């Protein structure tokens, strides 16, 4: 199991109160495969740096989770198939490096 961070940009036409329940459907992939979800942080509506699908705004959400690499790939695949998801990015956070003095 490895730690991951998922950033999702959701279509701004989706109501903000329905963002978390719809995200939860996708996050069930992680929990069903034995992974854990540490934190779901919905940033809300933000301006995009450049237009995506002719839209200048998006609803941002960041999820920290622990899962197997195959589970992370499957989650990314399922998110990319959904039309309300504009962009996804899954990264592995850098390990905290301890500096000896």
From Swiss-Prot:
GO terms for molecular function: small ribosomal subunit rRNA binding; structural constituent of ribosome. Keywords: Ribonucleoprotein, Ribosomal protein, RNA-binding, rRNA-binding. InterPro entries: Ribosomal_bS6 (IPR000529), Ribosomal_bS6_CS (IPR020815), Ribosomal_bS6_sf (IPR035980), Ribosomal_S6_plastid/chlpt (IPR020814), Transl_elong_EF1B/ribsomal_bS6 (IPR014717). Gene3D superfamilies: 3.30.70.60. Disulfide bonds: none annotated. One of its GO terms (cellular component) is ribosome. It comes from the Bacteria. One of its GO terms (biological process) is translation. Binds together with bS18 to 16S ribosomal RNA. Belongs to the bacterial ribosomal protein bS6 family. This is Small ribosomal subunit protein bS6. It comes from Pseudarthrobacter chlorophenolicus (strain ATCC 700700 / DSM 12829 / CIP 107037 / JCM 12360 / KCTC 9906 / NCIMB 13794 / A6).
């Amino acid at each position: 199991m490895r730690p991951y961070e998922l950033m999702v940009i959701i279509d701004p036409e989706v109501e903000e109160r329905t963002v978390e329940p719809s995200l939860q459907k996708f996050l069930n992939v992680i929990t069903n495969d034995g992974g854990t979800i540490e934190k779901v942080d919905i940033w809300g509506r933000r301006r995009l740096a450049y237009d995506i699908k002719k839209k200048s705004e998006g609803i941002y959400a960041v999820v920290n989770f622990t899962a197997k690499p195959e589970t992370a790939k499957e989650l990314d695949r399922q998110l990319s198939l959904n039309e309300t998801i504009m962009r996804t990015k899954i990264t592995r956070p850098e390990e905290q490096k301890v500096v000896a003095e």
